[in-house]
From Swiss-Prot:
Name of the protein described by the UniProt record: NADH-quinone oxidoreductase subunit K
Provenance organism: Escherichia coli (strain K12)
A cellular-component GO term for this protein: NADH dehydrogenase complex
GO MF annotation: an example: quinone binding
Family: Belongs to the complex I subunit 4L family.
Enzyme class: translocase
Entry's transmembrane regions: 4-24, 28-48, 60-80
Membrane topology: Multi-pass membrane protein
Xref: PANTHER family: NADH-UBIQUINONE OXIDOREDUCTASE CHAIN 4L (PTHR11434:SF16), NADH-UBIQUINONE OXIDOREDUCTASE SUBUNIT ND4L (PTHR11434)
The protein's role, per its UniProt record: NDH-1 shuttles electrons from NADH, via FMN and iron-sulfur (Fe-S) centers, to quinones in the respiratory chain. The immediate electron acceptor for the enzyme in this species is believed to be ubiquinone. Couples the redox reaction to proton translocation (for every two electrons transferred, four hydrogen ions are translocated across the cytoplasmic membrane), and thus conserves the redox energy in a proton gradient.
Length: 100
């Protein structure tokens, strides 16, 4: 069994990597990937904590987080596909330009 500290440290590292990818990258697809990494890191923290205390709540929260991530990914990818068809670019700077 993995100790609680090791699992939570791994989840924190994954969360920081996802947050870094979300903040630094200017491509919307990579920002979506960073958000997915952050969701998976929080799900990992739930599973590790639930395993440590012998509760099944962590696994239930993992299923909830995975279903949330799947819904977010499908909607996000559909929006990115439409944006790419309209602008031929997924750069956040070109998307934020206002028409006027």
């Amino acid at each position: 069994m993995i100790p609680l500290q090791h699992g939570l440290i791994l989840a924190a590292i994954l969360f920081v990597l996802g947050l870094t990818g979300l903040v630094i990258r200017r491509n919307l697809l990579f920002m979506l990937i960073g958000l997915e990494i952050m969701i998976n890191a929080s799900a990992l923290a739930f599973v590790v904590a639930g395993s440590y205390w012998g509760q099944t709540d962590g696994q239930v929260m993992y299923i909830l987080a995975i279903s949330l991530a799947a819904a977010e990914a499908s909607i996000g990818l559909a929006l990115l596909l439409q944006l790419h068809r309209r602008r031929q670019n997924l750069n956040i700077d070109s998307v934020s330009e206002m028409r006027g």
